[in-house]
Amino acid sequence: MQLRKEYLIAYDIEDNKTRTIIYKQLLAYGLKAVQKSVFWGYVSIAELNAIKRLFDSSLTISDKVFITRVNMHEQKLDYSFGYDDKTFKDWDEYGHI
């Protein structure tokens, strides 16, 4: 059983300060910024709950976010530009974040 599961997180946050705080926090959780407001990576249930609390406490009614489970490391991308084959394969279950 994997301790961490693979997620894709995307957001649209108006306030620059809030957006910067969220960006830095997601990096601190070991997620990879695959675009400016899109993150991919593996998180534990506790980390996922902390990320949800971060969004709940930081977002306003005009902001948007979605978090979804993905399985990108095992499947071939239908189309991509600017990403190589290793972009979504660099995580080690027993490595460090």
UniProtKB/Swiss-Prot annotation:
It holds the Pfam family CRISPR_Cas2. One of its GO terms (biological process) is defense response to virus. Mg(2+) binds at D12. Its EC number is 3.1.-.-. InterPro entries: CRISPR_associated_Cas2, Virulence_VapD/CRISPR_Cas2. CDD domains: Cas2_I_II_III. Disulfide bonds: none annotated. It is an enzyme of class 3 (hydrolase). It comes from the Bacteria. The keyword Membrane does not apply. Keywords: Antiviral defense, Endonuclease, Hydrolase, Magnesium, Metal-binding, Nuclease. Induction: In culture expression is high during mid-log phase (2 hour), then decreases to nearly undetectable levels in late stationary phase (16 hours). During infection of mouse bone marrow-derived macrophages (BMDM) expression is maximal after 1 hour, when the bacteria is expected to be in the phagosome. One of its GO terms (molecular function) is metal ion binding. Its cofactor is Mg(2+). Disruption phenotype: No effect on expression of bacterial lipoprotein FTN_1103. Bacteria are as virulent in mice as wild-type bacteria. Part of a type II CRISPR-Cas system. CRISPR (clustered regularly interspaced short palindromic repeat) is an adaptive immune system that provides protection against mobile genetic elements (viruses, transposable elements and conjugative plasmids). CRISPR clusters contain sequences complementary to antecedent mobile elements and target invading nucleic acids. CRISPR clusters are transcribed and processed into CRISPR RNA (crRNA). Functions as a ssRNA-specific endoribonuclease. Involved in the integration of spacer DNA into the CRISPR cassette. Belongs to the CRISPR-associated endoribonuclease Cas2 protein family. Homodimer, forms a heterotetramer with a Cas1 homodimer. This is CRISPR-associated endoribonuclease Cas2 1. It comes from Francisella tularensis subsp. novicida (strain U112).
